[in-house]
């Protein structure tokens, strides 16, 4: 191995030497040392709109006590679950106690991981008042989103969540702006090129 390495340093024409222009790494968001990226991919990255220009990525709620605040949807009275609410204001002023909860989960591409509901009576006042809980980005609760789990054993998988879900700290979510639909965003996130780039 040492002899081949020395030969590759001395002779740029050996067939096992791979050279890249280091300035190209600066063109890739986050500047990873991605020696495998071709000129064509660099060109696509340079010409493409940045993800941060069309979405807002947010992390959600951490209950700090899932046994107290979370249930599987079939464990509670069905008529106490608030489906399809579009804002925390509407949820707070309803007679509903439990609301759909995006907690992430196993590999599910396009759709899925919708098993949980969260105790969110009167707009989640118990969670807001719990000193151990962290309620992040509540202004984004109940909005349409694309989500993925923070822990995965294989490739990332992105899923669609319609309006009406509160999201967890492990069910990361992105919220499309008016320049892209959630369905188009989902298609982009689940395609092979995007998978290769992340």
Where are these regions (language model features)?
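Basic, amphipathic alpha-helical recognition segments used for DNA target recognition
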Residues: 149-198
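Polynucleotide-recognition surfaces of large bacterial nucleic-acid defense/processing enzymes
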Residues: 1-129, 134-145, 151
